[in-house]
Amino acid sequence: MKDIVVYFTGTGKNKKVAEAIKEYLKCDVIEVKDKLKRNFLRDSFYSLIGASVEIEPKTFDFKDYERVFIVTPIWAFNIPAPMRTFLTRNKDAIKDREIVFVSSCGLGEKNRPVINKLSKILGKNVSASLLIEETNVDSQVYKDIISKFLDNI
């Protein structure tokens, strides 16, 4: 089974998570980048209203992959606009793939309802999910958490 990690990061924490998954699974990785400078209020607002933003890459060919790891922060109890934009544009390309959601987020498991929002964006359920509290990324505990999670999916 060939895997790919698709990640977006605002502070760099989800990049660390994506790189840990890549290292553990020896898989490919792509970063979704938006063209806006970080602004807490605007970013939160865009997440709340479901706004689309300019991103790179706009689309991606997932034909060589069976499992897609979506790694992103959670902003204002929503998927950030850059990742939402990417997923909306690539929804058909990943519809037949297994989806795994991983996030480094401030509230950890309290953000679990966001997974339902992700499922609505994708039009399908995720097969597994992991919500890592940001403090675990700061303390380097996240690598153990990720490896245990990956061993069990």
Residue map of PLM features:
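Short, structured coil segments at secondary-structure junctions
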Residues: L25, I121-N125
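Glycine-rich phosphate/pyrophosphate-binding loop and the adjoining helix
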Residues: V126-I153
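Short beta-alpha junction loops
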Residues: S103-E109, E134-T135
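Residues at alpha-helix caps and immediate loop-helix transition turns in enzyme cores, especially N-
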Residues: V17, I79-M83, K110-V114, V141-Y142
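Short, conserved loop/helix-junction motifs that constitute active-site signature segments
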Residues: F62-K63, T88-D96, L122-G123
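N-terminal beta1-alpha1-beta2 submodule of the flavodoxin-like/Rossmannoid cofactor-binding fold
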Residues: M1-V71, F77-P80, T85-T88, S147-I153
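Short, aromatic/basic amphipathic alpha-helical patches
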Residues: R112-L122
